[in-house]
Each structure stands twice: as structure tokens, then as C-alpha cells.
């Protein structure tokens, strides 16, 4: 798991107290079998957020960790919780909550891989599949559950998920979980009331608004805050451009021109609605372009198949709504196209963060109509960046 160490080391953090920065995984005093899992997974040295946050999580403190996409936040909380788990006890000891099924499944995969030599058992509990499958899995000595709030709360209420000895709760992509948009906040509160009063809480996200930080006070005790300084959230490793298409109906031809001209490994195209995803996928397929698509209305088996095809490289172009913008890690994505400018400012950084993973160079291209120009200006102002016009010579993008 390589990343651009120079770019990562330039990140500046604002912390609530002076923190020890661990230059190596060995200096964190991790279990030998956990270290084996870390190195086998491909990590060589900790990223900036890992070098600051892992030791704080291991110490048992409540932690709020914020860093840009692709810097290893999932491994940060995973290493912390795996260090805390008692391998001899087969009871549930860690609970990870995520806003999407795909992200919950990805976290479970990272936990299982890093914890392989510890013989830790983990399971992803998400909607969209038979409840009985989850009940069967968690009843068999499951030490870590990674899931979506609705399914996890349902299983706790049914008393099939026993949380009485749970040591650590992780909220991944916390701004989504605690925001008003997706309606998870009450479910998070309800889950929290079922957990032991001594539970350690770790909150992780690429963006962290003042409102979300205020909400965390309700269930966190004097948390250590590790936040990227505001002017560092520009994702410098990603070249950002716009194409002024003037009218909505001209976007499609522009996309076809780009598709023909660019040499890419893998690409994600974001639309704001499920209807637009289906329309664009159908239209591109009719024009003999090979694409796959995914959104929240699809059955879970379909979404899983799309994800597997994209991860394996079988599919090169994926069209999606913002369900895919959060935390999903596919290393070979080199291009993100915002067919629609996101309605939510925070989603811009989550979308373009799909390219440039772990410091790799990536490109983001934004299609804008006359009506969308103010949105682009708002994004530039919010992130203190300048998004350039797409160069006439498209080879400059590669």
C-alpha cells in the first residue's frame, strides 16, 4: 500500500493537545501479529494521520480524526481497534458504523485482512440482504461488526447482537452519519444508548464541520482532536479542471469527446440523481461505450457485482450517484468526472478524492452549465482553490 510520502508529509494538522508522532509502526508498540498483518497488507510506514491518531486510539481516549481522502483513515481506526481486541474473548468488542453498505463491507475487508494473523472474526451487517445471514454470522463468535446504522440497530433491538462488552465504537464518514441529509443521526443516538457507558468513541471523516463537532459533544468525553488545517484540504495531488458546456444537453457530446481522447486506467462519473445515472449509462451503452453503473435503488447483489467488476479492473468506467463518493478505495482510478456539480459542498472533496488515492496523481473534470457556474465559484471559495479550464490539448491531462 504505497503513497506519495512527500505530499503526505506536507499536511499540517491542528490538534487539541500536543501529540506524539510515530514515524514507524514498530514505535507504536503494536502486537507482533498485528504488525505482520500491516506489512502483509502492504503498508511500509504510517501516513500523517496514522502516525498521529493510532497511538491516541490505542491509549483508550476518544478521538476525532479528520484527514483528506486516500490517506489511510480506515487503516487508522482498524489498527487501533485490533490492538484493543482480546483475541481470546469471542464476544463483540468493536462496532464500526458507516453510511453506505459498500463502505461498511470495505471496512470489514480491511479489518479482516489486517487482523488475519490475530484470528479476529469480523462481519459486515448491512441492509439489502437477508437478516438471517447476519444473525447466523454474529451468533458465531463475532468480535467486530462493521455495518450500516439501520441494520445494526435492528439487530441490537432483536437482541441478536450483544453489545454489553463492546469496547470501541467507530463512526466512519461521521459528517454523513451525524448530518441531517440521510437521517442516520437518531439511529446513531439510539445505538449509543445501548452501548456500555465506558465505550471509547472514534469519529473519522474527510470533512468535519463545526455543527458535527458540536454534535459529538453529546457522546464523546474530552476527545483528542486531530484535524487537517483548513487550507490543506485542497487535494493538491489532483489536477482540477472545468468544461463550460453552456447547456445541459451539450454535456453528453462533451463526455463522448473526452472518452475518445483520454487514456485512463479507471474513471468514475458522478451524477446527482439515480435517474440521471440510468439515463447516462443507457445512452453511453447505445453509443457503444462500455460502462457500468451503481446507485442506491439497485439490489445489493447487483451493487456487489458492479463493485467486484470495478475493483478487479473488468469494468473501467463507473457511473454513480454520491453513494460511491464516500471512502470507497479503488487504487487505479485516475479520473473523476462530475457530470453534475454536487449539490453539497462537502461531496465535492469526497468525489474527487476517488482519484489521487494515497498521493497518486489524479484528474478531476467538472462539467458546468451556465446555471452551475455559481456552484463552481462556491466550491473554489470554500476550498480556497482555483479550478482551471480544461486545456485544449487533452494529452496534458494524462
Curated annotation (Swiss-Prot):
GO molecular function annotations of the record: ATP binding; ATP hydrolysis activity; RNA binding; RNA helicase activity
Pfam families in the cross-refs: DEAD, Helicase_C
Superkingdom, taxonomy of origin: Eukaryota
Enzyme Commission numbers on file: 3.6.4.13
Keyword Iron: no
Motif (Q motif): 23-51
Sequence motif DEAD box, location on chain: 172-175
Keyword entries, A-Z: ATP-binding, Helicase, Hydrolase, Nucleotide-binding, Nucleus, Ribosome biogenesis, RNA-binding, rRNA processing
Major location category of this protein: nucleus
Keyword hit for Transferase: no
Positions annotated to bind ATP: 67-74
Location of this chain's protein in the cell: Nucleus, Nucleolus
Residue ranges occupied by any Helicase ATP-binding domain in the UniProt entry: 54-226
Reaction catalyzed: ATP + H2O = ADP + phosphate + H(+)
Similarity-based family: Belongs to the DEAD box helicase family. DDX48/FAL1 subfamily.
Record comment regarding domains: The Q motif is unique to and characteristic of the DEAD box family of RNA helicases and controls ATP binding and hydrolysis.
Record's function text: ATP-dependent RNA helicase involved in 40S ribosomal subunit biogenesis. Required for the processing and cleavage of 35S pre-rRNA at sites A0, A1, and A2, leading to mature 18S rRNA.
Protein name: ATP-dependent RNA helicase FAL1
Gene name tied to this protein: FAL1
Amino acid at each position: 500500500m504505497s503513497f506519495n510520502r512527500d505530499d503526505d508529509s506536507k499536511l499540517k494538522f491542528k490538534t487539541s493537545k500536543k501529540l506524539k508522532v510515530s514515524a514507524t509502526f514498530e514505535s507504536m508498540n503494536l502486537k507482533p501479529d498485528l504488525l505482520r498483518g500491516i506489512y502483509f497488507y502492504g503498508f511500509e510506514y504510517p501516513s500523517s494521520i496514522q502516525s498521529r491518531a493510532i497511538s491516541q486510539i490505542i491509549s483508550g481516549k476518544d478521538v476525532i480524526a479528520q484527514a483528506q481522502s486516500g490517506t489511510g483513515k480506515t487503516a487508522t481506526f482498524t489498527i487501533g481497534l485490533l490492538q484493543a481486541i482480546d483475541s481470546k474473548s469471542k464476544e463483540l468488542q468493536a462496532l464500526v458504523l458507516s453510511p453506505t453498505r459498500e463502505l461498511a463491507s470495505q471496512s470489514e475487508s480491511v479489518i479482516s485482512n489486517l487482523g488475519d494473523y490475530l484470528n479476529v472474526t469480523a462481519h459486515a451487517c448491512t441492509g439489502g440482504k437477508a437478516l438471517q445471514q447476519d444473525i447466523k454470522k454474529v451468533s458465531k463468535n463475532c468480535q467486530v461488526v462493521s455495518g450500516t446504522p439501520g441494520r445494526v440497530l435492528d439487530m441490537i433491538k432483536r437482541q441478536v447482537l450483544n453489545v454489553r462488552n463492546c469496547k470501541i465504537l467507530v463512526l466512519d464518514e461521521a459528517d454523513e452519519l451525524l448530518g441531517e441529509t440521510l437521517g442516520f443521526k437518531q439511529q446513531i443516538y439510539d445505538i449509543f444508548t445501548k452501548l456500555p457507558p465506558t465505550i471509547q468513541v472514534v469519529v473519522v471523516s474527510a470533512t468535519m464541520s463545526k455543527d458535527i463537532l458540536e454534535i459529538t459533544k453529546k457522546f464523546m468525553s474530552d476527545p483528542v482532536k486531530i484535524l487537517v488545517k483548513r487550507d490543506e484540504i485542497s487535494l493538491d495531488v489532483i489536477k482540477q479542471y472545468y468544461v463550460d458546456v453552456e447547456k445541459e444537453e451539450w454535456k453528453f457530446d462533451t463526455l463522448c469527446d473526452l472518452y475518445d481522447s483520454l487514456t485512463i486506467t479507471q474513471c468514475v462519473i458522478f451524477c446527482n440523481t439515480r435517474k440521471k445515472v440510468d439515463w447516462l449509462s443507457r445512452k453511453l451503452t447505445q453509443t457503444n461505450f462500455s460502462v457500468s453503473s451503481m446507485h442506491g435503488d439497485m439490489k445489493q447483489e447487483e451493487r456487489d457485482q458492479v463493485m467486484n467488476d470495478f475493483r478487479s479492473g473488468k469494468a473501467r468506467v463507473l457511473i454513480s450517484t454520491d453513494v460511491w463518493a464516500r471512502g470507497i478505495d479503488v487504487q487505479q482510478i485516475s479520473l473523476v468526472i462530475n457530470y453534475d456539480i454536487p449539490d453539497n459542498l462537502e461531496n465535492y472533496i469526497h468525489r474527487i478524492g476517488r482519484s489521487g488515492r494515497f498521493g497518486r496523481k489524479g484528474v478531476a473534470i467538472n462539467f458546468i452549465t451556465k446555471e452551475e457556474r455559481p456552484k463552481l465559484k462556491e466550491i473554489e471559495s470554500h476550498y480556497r482553490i482555483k479550478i482551471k479550464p480544461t486545456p485544449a490539448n487533452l494529452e496534458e491531462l494524462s
